[in-house]
Amino acid sequence: MLDSFDKGWFVLQTYSGYENKVKENLLQRAQTYNMLDNILRVEIPTQTVNVEKNGQTKEIEENRFPGYVLVEMVMTDEAWFVVRNTPNVTGFVGSHGNRSKPTPLLEEEIRAILLSMGQTIDVFDTNIKEGDVVQIIDGAFMGQEGRVVEIENNKVKLMLNMFGSETVAEVELYQIAEL
């Protein structure tokens, strides 16, 4: 269960097509209800896609997860109430009903989403160090275990055992998890 003052990233479910309005309303409500210390950041993951129309290709931004908005917040009762009662928010993902508080995203999940958006992210505290055995949780080597041989600037070199021989692979820090 989440302590009443844990900070984390949470996923809001919204009516599809209302993501920008929810972001706008939520930021306004955070200011109105004096919650700017609790409701820290609101993001709508987008991606650039090429659309061909009338023989012309055009780049457009589209929502990566239609009907969902990410919010970084300190989960107090008051902040939960303000967010939950924002117009066009239908609920929190990971909330198990009965007015229970939701489960935050895992650090690796939010890191991957923000990096895919080209966002700068805070450096996350990690206990991973050279010599540790870790599991790759994202990318081409997902599911493999490897030994950390070097960590530099959020890049990690791992020694993997593939096809009976050891191979060095370089992955991003967000792509691995401690075992």
UniProtKB/Swiss-Prot annotation:
Judging by the UniProt lineage, the source's domain of life is Bacteria
Q: Which SUPFAM superfamilies match?
A: N-utilization substance G protein NusG, N-terminal domain, Translation proteins SH3-like domain
List each copy of the KOW domain by range: 130-157
Q: Pfam families, alphabetically?
A: KOW (PF00467), NusG (PF02357)
Cysteine pairings via disulfide bonds: none
Q: Write out the entry's keywords from A to Z.
A: Transcription, Transcription antitermination, Transcription regulation, Transcription termination
Q: One cellular component GO annotation, for this chain's record?
A: cytosol
One GO biological process term? transcription antitermination
Which HAMAP family does this entry report, sorted A to Z?
Answer: NusG
* Protein task: Participates in transcription elongation, termination and antitermination.
Per the similarity annotation, which family is this?
Belongs to the NusG family.
Q: What is this protein called?
A: Transcription termination/antitermination protein NusG
Recite the lineage of the species. Bacteria, Bacillati, Bacillota, Bacilli, Lactobacillales
Q: Which gene encodes it?
A: nusG
